[in-house]
Amino acid sequence: MHGTEEKMKNFNMMKKLLALTLGAAMLLAVMTGCGKKDTAQEPTDDQQQQQEEQQPAEPATLLEQIKAKGKVVVGTEAQYAPYEFKDLDANFAGCDMWLAQQIADSLGVELEVVDMAFDGIIPAVQSGQVDLGIAAFTNTPERAEEIDFSDLYETSAQLLIVKAGNADTYSTKESLVGLKVGAQKGTIQSQLIQSALPESELFELEKYPALALEVQNGNIAGLVVDQAVGEALVASSNGALEVSNFTFTAEEASFGKSVVIAKGNEDLVAVVNEVINKVTADGSYQKAYDEAVELAASLGL
């Protein structure tokens, strides 16, 4: 009996030793695992530097971003022939769109055009929704406070377009006192009416075709517009519109057109200026302008 008790004691002791051994082994495994995990979470300075060097750097400037994405996005308002409009296949056309393509080609990227309300283009440029604004923008000190301008690519006079038969009726500032004179919303023409015709009532709409219809229907005395656009409106009106004999002075209304670019992008401005200086010097912009006038006329725009 004593032998049996002795055997039981030895057996129980072995069980305790085995349990202690297994517990120690498990604890060691857990500690080892934790140690490995901590080591993986905290790379050395050399490893950290190597990882940072391997990560591609984000494009810093707008010019670099354009080249990285492989396209330049241009905002315009495509109802302003001959500068920007759409052809019969709904493709963007006009001398401004031709200029946009020259800029894209110079950058070695594709051109993407976004059609939007004219008064939304500058905010879109500022926010980065589009890269450039090309929509016959007049270079003014007020706008230059918000965005940067390229060099001028065209200078044009301003016309007063009236209903056929009213060319002499509305030929002086006095003849327009108290009458509505139209312009596209957000344009320099709106400012011109307020400054040069302070006793007339400014009438604004989003689109020039709608303004032309208001003139034809006799709802407004006339509309103020760039010379090329005004001549195109008259040519496509089937005799319903004509150019008034009213004239603005050169100080009032000799406006130059520029490309709109967000502030702080001098390198992109330089590229755009290089293109503008080339196409204005070699006559290719004038050729594109003449072709745009012909195309717009053939489309009745």
PLM features: what roles do these ranges have?
Residues 39, 55-58, 188-205, 242-248, ...:
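Ligand-binding clefts/hinges and TM-proximal coupling segments of bilobed small-molecule sensing domains
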Residues 155-162, 235-274, 296-301:
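Periplasmic-binding protein-like
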Residues 112-123, 168, 203-217, 228:
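Short helix-initiation/N-cap motifs at beta->coil->alpha
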Residues 46-52, 97-106, 180, 185-187, ...:
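Extended ligand-binding regions for polar small-molecule ligands
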Residues 45, 57-136:
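Extracytoplasmic small-molecule ligand-binding "clamshell" domains
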Residues 31-44:
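Bacterial lipoprotein signal-peptidase II cleavage site
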Residues 101, 105, 110-175, 248-250:
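Acidic, polar ligand-binding/catalytic clefts
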Residues 120, 137-145, 192-195, 216-217, ...:
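A ligand-binding cleft/hinge motif common to bilobed small-molecule-binding domains
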